[in-house]
Curated annotation (Swiss-Prot):
<dbReference type="GO" id="GO:0010569">
    <property type="term" value="P:regulation of double-strand break repair via homologous recombination"/>
</dbReference>
<dbReference type="InterPro" id="IPR050304">
    <property type="entry name" value="MT-severing_AAA_ATPase"/>
</dbReference>
<comment type="subunit">
    <text>Hexamer. Interacts (via N-terminal one-half region) with RAD51; the interaction is direct. Interacts (via N-terminal one-half region) with SPIDR (via the C-terminal region); the interaction is direct. Interacts with FIRRM; may regulate homologous recombination.</text>
</comment>
<feature type="binding site">
    <location>
        <begin position="447"/>
        <end position="452"/>
    </location>
    <ligand>
        <name>ATP</name>
    </ligand>
</feature>
<feature type="compositionally biased region" description="Polar residues">
    <location>
        <begin position="347"/>
        <end position="358"/>
    </location>
</feature>
<comment type="similarity">
    <text>Belongs to the AAA ATPase family.</text>
</comment>
<dbReference type="GO" id="GO:0000228">
    <property type="term" value="C:nuclear chromosome"/>
</dbReference>
<keyword id="KW-0460">Magnesium</keyword>
<dbReference type="GO" id="GO:0071479">
    <property type="term" value="P:cellular response to ionizing radiation"/>
</dbReference>
<keyword id="KW-0007">Acetylation</keyword>
<keyword id="KW-0067">ATP-binding</keyword>
<keyword id="KW-0539">Nucleus</keyword>
<feature type="region of interest" description="Disordered">
    <location>
        <begin position="203"/>
        <end position="232"/>
    </location>
</feature>
<dbReference type="GO" id="GO:0005634">
    <property type="term" value="C:nucleus"/>
</dbReference>
<feature type="compositionally biased region" description="Polar residues">
    <location>
        <begin position="264"/>
        <end position="280"/>
    </location>
</feature>
<dbReference type="GO" id="GO:0000287">
    <property type="term" value="F:magnesium ion binding"/>
</dbReference>
<keyword id="KW-1017">Isopeptide bond</keyword>
Length: 677
């Protein structure tokens, strides 16, 4: 009977996959999955001797070729891209990618490419062929020549400017340029058609008395660009590059129209030959030059250093505007004398704002209510950085918790509603002796919902919830722990009503002894004083809720201040059933009421966390019943629902986390100090 049912399932799967393959509306991914399933069925049938070897070989070859046609196809519509999806998913989730990386490709690099250089040279050859032989009065050479201009006078009328000959790099002969070549020659008139005045000449653009470099870079029409060694002496006047500086217009072009035409022709020539649009760098005494090489690659770390330098320069400029005030600094910049003021290593956000007389900490998740609390008189003696730390890290902004989310512990929930939630919701009714207590202690075995009760108190009463631990209040600096405790209660008074939840309170308020460290003793003393001391007010609506698994280790003074001490026992049968029903309602489960009762009976002594682990282990039963080959091809709908046999297998691996000896200890402590039944 079982064999016939398995064969019918295989036939149904074969027909389903074959219909997917024959369909024209299915995606290549679905077809590839169907082909893989068919190949697996062929292998299983041959392994069970249901088909012959020849028939299995022919079928396997046929479907393998069809499967390969989909996998190896380059067509986007009919093929399956089995690499790009996973690669894009991995590349999209990389955290090390930085938007600070810069590309090494720029416009100057494009002009340095060999193909672009060939195109520019071809254009120059065509431009040269258009010139008449008589107009080619400018000497052209294969290598560029840098001419030194030691003296350049102002030309006017019959005066001419003589240029000294300059040495050419290498073994080439010196070439002299006559004075009239600086005037508007026919070659220059070709480049600048509107500048035809024969009386124009170049003038120095440098003001009198300013020392500049008198070098003239002439870019050739052919050949590579080279420079002469910059070992020439400085002169009193300088000549900027003729084609790259728009201010170097002929002195004779005093007409605005001629000057405009000269600038327009200069721009056109620079666009036609981009290599002429590079101004030479100024020569310094040290002989340093401007680096024209390819831009170097900057990593995210180098870019971060550059940004930090920019911010430091900006902060220096900003600090100078504060009436010459000196900003506090750490490290080598501070005074090391015996009379120097000590600057604490902990960053104080108030230092930068003391000069202006106000405090401006960063905005936190508390929203728009934070500025109103920072101006409160109760926070005037609290450091702003501690207020910011409490608002950002200690204040809890999690989802709300309802009483229905907590299974069992009906007595504890009713007591908490009576003495905590209702007084916080209606403080006008619960006054005087009806006022809420200052502290509540929730003790019991682990995994019974003590933390959920603390969150539910804050959610249902509309109070601000502070979740702290011993690590959030301790510090390696002397006196910082007490300040943090004082700041915590100061912020809580500004955020009334407030609930301060301390998980594992025995680690923070343990019994004080002779061998205890001084810093931990001061933190405990400050906490007890803030909880119920001479400076506290009876009108403060601040509730301290502590949860612990070891109530016998709490200090006597802390136990006295935690007035209501409620025992949170293990969940009863009804509570365990509620946990199982709630968890199984989110999964595919076929448990009957009788089977659920059996699970509840067998889970006697389990905590709430143990019941959750039991259900999680049972939910893995249907997955474990599958074969390894079926996991790769099976769909989620084909996974069978959770059955009672899965819970039976889960009971073999999941054990209760609380021993009867521990339960006896909790019950004895509850009889001695507890406030429950």
């Amino acid at each position: 009977m079982e064999t016939s049912s398995s064969r019918s399932v295989q036939v149904d799967d074969w027909q389903k996959n074959y219909s997917v393959v024959a369909s024209s509306i299915c995606t290549p991914k679905q077809k590839a999955d169907a082909y893989r399933a068919l190949l697996l069925h062929i292998q299983d049938a041959y392994a069970n001797s249901e088909i012959s070897q020849v028939f299995a070989t022919n079928l396997f070859k046929r479907y393998t070729e069809k499967y390969s046609a989909i996998i190896d196809s380059d067509n986007v519509v009919t093929g399956l891209n089995n690499y790009a999806e996973s690669i894009f998913a991995l590349a999209g989730s990389q955290q090390a990618d930085s938007d600070k990386w810069q590309s090494g490709l720029s416009i100057n690099n494009v002009f340095k490419m060999s193909t672009v250089q060939e195109m520019m040279q071809a254009g120059q050859k065509f431009k040269e062929s258009l010139l008449e032989p008589a107009d080619a009065s400018v000497v052209m050479c294969k290598e560029p020549t840098i001419f030194e201009v030691p003296q350049l006078g102002v030309c006017g009328g019959s005066e001419e400017a003589d240029l000294l000959s300059s040495s050419v790099h290498g073994t080439e002969k010196t070439q002299a340029i006559p004075g009239n070549s600086l005037r508007c020659s026919p070659f220059q008139s070709t480049l600048f058609p509107m500048a035809t005045n024969t009386k124009t000449c170049l003038t120095s653009s440098a003001p009198s008395g300013e020392s500049t470099t008198a070098t003239f870079h002439r870019t050739p029409l052919f050949g590579n660009t080279k420079k002469e060694p910059q070992s020439f002496p400085k002169t009193s006047t300088g000549l900027n590059m003729f084609l790259s500086n728009p201010s170097c217009v002929p002195s004779g072009c005093e007409n605005p129209r001629e000057r405009k035409a000269f600038n327009d022709s200069d721009t056109i020539n620079m666009l036609s030959n981009p290599t002429l649009n590079k101004a030479p760098s100024k020569t310094e005494d040290s002989g340093q030059r401007e680096d024209n090489s390819l831009p170097t690659f900057k990593t995210a770390k180098e870019q971060l250093w550059a940004d930090q330098k920019k911010r430091s320069h900006q902060s220096q400029h900003t600090s100078k505007s504060f009436n010459g005030a000196i900003k506090k600094s750490l490290g080598a910049g501070r005074s090391r004398g015996i009379f120097g003021k000590f600057v604490p290593p902990v960053s104080n956000k108030q230092d930068g704002s003391e000069q202006n007389g106000n405090v401006k900490p960063k905005s936190s998740r508390a929203g728009s209510a934070e500025p109103a609390h920072l101006t409160d008189d109760r926070l005037k003696n609290v450091e702003p950085r501690m207020v910011e730390l409490i608002m950002n890290e200690i204040m809890d902004h999690g989802p709300p918790v309802h009483w229905e989310d907590i299974a069992g512990v009906e007595f504890a929930k009713a007591t908490i509603k009576e003495i905590v939630v209702w007084p916080m919701m209606r403080p006008d009714i619960f006054t005087g002796l009806r006022g809420p207590p200052k502290g509540i202690l929730l003790f019991g075995p682990p995994g019974t919902g003590k933390t959920l009760i603390g969150k539910c108190i804050a959610s249902q009463s509309g109070a601000t919830f502070f979740s702290i631990s011993a690590s959030s209040l301790t510090s390696k600096w002397v006196g910082e722990g007490e300040k943090m405790v004082r700041a915590l209660f100061a912020v809580a008074r500004c955020q009334q009503p407030a609930v301060i939840f301390i998980d594992e309170i025995d680690s923070l308020l343990s019994q004080r002894g002779d061998g205890e460290h001084e810093s931990s003793r001061r933190i405990k003393t400050e906490f007890l004083v803030q909880l119920d001391g001479a400076t506290t007010s009876s009108e403060d609506r601040i509730l301290v809720v502590g949860a612990t698994n070891r109530p016998q280790e709490i200090d006597e003074a802390a136990r006295r201040r935690l007035v209501k001490r409620l025992y949170i026992p293990l969940p009863e049968a009804s509570a365990r059933k509620q946990i199982v029903v709630n968890l199984m309602s989110k999964e595919q489960c076929c448990l009957t009421d009788e089977e659920t009762e059996l699970v509840v009976q067998q889970s006697d002594g389990f905590s709430g966390a143990d019941m959750t682990q039991l259900c999680r282990e049972a939910s893995l039963g249907p997955i474990r019943s599958l074969h390894t080959a079926d996991i790769a091809t099976i769909s989620p709908d084909q996974v069978r629902p959770i059955a009672y046999i899965d819970f039976e297998n889960a009971f073999r691996t999941v054990r209760p986390s609380v021993s009867p000896k521990d339960l006896e200890l909790y019950e004895n402590w509850n009889k001695t100090f507890g406030c429950g039944k």
